[in-house]
Amino acid sequence: MFRTLHQVLRLSRAPGAGGAGTPPRQRKIVLVAETGCDLTPERAGELGVYLVPMHVSMGLETRPDGSFPPEEVFAYYDRTGEVPQTSAASQYDFERVFNEIESLNPGADIVHLAYSASTTASFHNALMAAAGSGYRVLSVDTKHVSVGQAAVVIEAARLLREHPELTPELLGAAAERIAAKTHMCFVPQNLDYLRAGGRVSNAAALISGVLNLHPCISVSDGRLVAGRKYRGSMVKVARRLIRDEAQAHDFRRDMLYFIRSPGLPDEVRKAAEDEARSCGFERTEWVRTGCVITCHGGPGAFGVVGFSR
């Protein structure tokens, strides 16, 4: 658990705030996130998290994220030379999910841990949906995408389970602290999707004809930003990326998430697991990207998400 969260939990035990010496809160808190966080429906169900669909457009057809496998993104690109366009969860999408939550959990508080507001309108659309609903909804911009957002959601869900006395405001403050200590980056196997996509800030500066060039795409203040470059095989890149990120952000060693898009070779997965063990990580978990981030990373991408001490 994050040390900074202990301060939040102490606040929850202050007079009038619930916690020690007072009954648990009677109103349930329900967590919400977008499908772009790449939690599977099964994992989200285990955590008690409701998922709101983002969208992917291929030509004139727009489909909900999660309703088809990401391999179809690759097939569309191979066929057309165009990367599918991603779009936010709409106001209607949030209204539908908020209504479902209210019908199953009357009077519940809703805490929405949002996909980065700098990259999509989902956060704004959730605010609009909440304003017209009359429900108790708190939206928090995690300033993360994909597995970075998932890591924040997972930690917040664990915190809520362990401390049901938390108010939505305290849980939201805790989620912001978690997000500030969460660091995500990934490395595409090739540059094709970055060239065709255009969603990554300053990506053009890293695109060249050099073979085996792998730009590291990190999340900075909610935006995807191209940073340092790696050369060589993805096996070597994966090992170096783990070492570099663990050192740069002083990662806690209790948990490290691995990001993989479809097509990542098994030898890269094994190398990553071996490197994580040698760096002292106690647990690792692989998360397969969904359609939204796959549109940016392409096939065979590898990344990590960790937590600063």
Model-derived features: positions:
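Short gly/ser-rich anion-binding loops that grip negatively charged ligand groups
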Residues: P84-Q91, H112-T119, T142, S146
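N-terminal glycine-rich anion-binding loop in soluble enzyme alpha/beta folds
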Residues: I29-E95
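Short beta-strand/turn micro-motifs composed of small residues
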Residues: A33, A114, R260
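Generic hydrophobic/packing signal
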Residues: F98, E102, A114-A117, A130-V137, ...
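Broad hydrophobic/π-residue packing in well-ordered secondary structure
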Residues: M58, T62-R63, P70-A75, F98, ...
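Short, basic, glycine/proline-bearing loop/turn elements
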Residues: M1-L9, T80-P84
